[in-house]
Amino acid sequence: MIAKLIWKDIRENFINTLIFAGLILAMTIYSLVKNFKDVRSLAVLSILIVAFSFIMVLGYAIYRGFSSLKREKDRNTLEFLLSLPVDGLEIVTSKFLAFFTEVLLLSLCIALFSHIPLFYMLITKAIGKAEFISAVKTITYIAFYFFLLALFLFIVFQFYEILVLSLKTKNFFVNAILFFVYLYLLSELIAIFKKVFGFLPDQPPILHTIGGETFTIMGGTNYQGLAAGALAGVVLIVSGIILFNKKVEV
């Protein structure tokens, strides 16, 4: 049943994924046509392709997290109600895995397209093989970082959607207050988890240089933060499944 639900969700959203992939490719081609000549500009271009692409993907993650369950619930059709499993494990897990598949495809597209300027620099001998490999490591890490961030945002907002459905709150201001309280408690939970992973290095992963320039991500995210975010995501998924089973009524 989970496999059927995943395929159903992917079919309904594959057009969105294709549109995003097309936008990312168009942005890449347009940027290259702008005739960036120096190495630093091409290096920055690769970073910008990754950054702006994932801004779109992160926005999509928030939208999907907010609307995934509510949209299904609002359909209220006999066909959907008959096909809907009452088990929260199937609903929550299938939604997450479907989005995981979509964002993985987008991440691969972003990683591939953002390497185009690097290949251009290598072909034109603007950089050597060693610097090319260094740049590839940096771009790949940044893409992987945003991939994890997109998944985390989806999980965060999906759990909030389950929370709202379980509490049956329809007042906008009540939901807004609930949202900010939820984010505050989540930040406190992550802070606790960071202490749990205190044995990990308290420093950002090492980023290599591109064209002689060193790039960092959002001030640098250390290993403790990455581990704490991953554990918090698991907690939210499990809590969402339990809450869905006990409180959400279809």
Regions found by a protein language model. Name each.
Residues 1-67, 159, 165, 172, ...:
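Hydrophobic alpha-helical transmembrane segments
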Residues 11-15, 89-110, 181-185:
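Alpha-helical transmembrane segments of multi-pass membrane proteins
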Residues 33-61, 94-165:
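Secretory targeting signals
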Residues 51, 141, 145-149, 179, ...:
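Pore-lining and gate-forming transmembrane alpha-helices of multi-pass membrane transport proteins
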Residues 69-100:
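Helix-loop-helix units of permease transmembrane domains in multi-pass membrane transporters
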Residues 109-119, 186-198:
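C-terminal TM-helix exit segments that contain a strictly Trp-centered aromatic cap at the helix terminus
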Residues 170-180:
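Internal alpha-helical transmembrane segments of multi-pass membrane proteins
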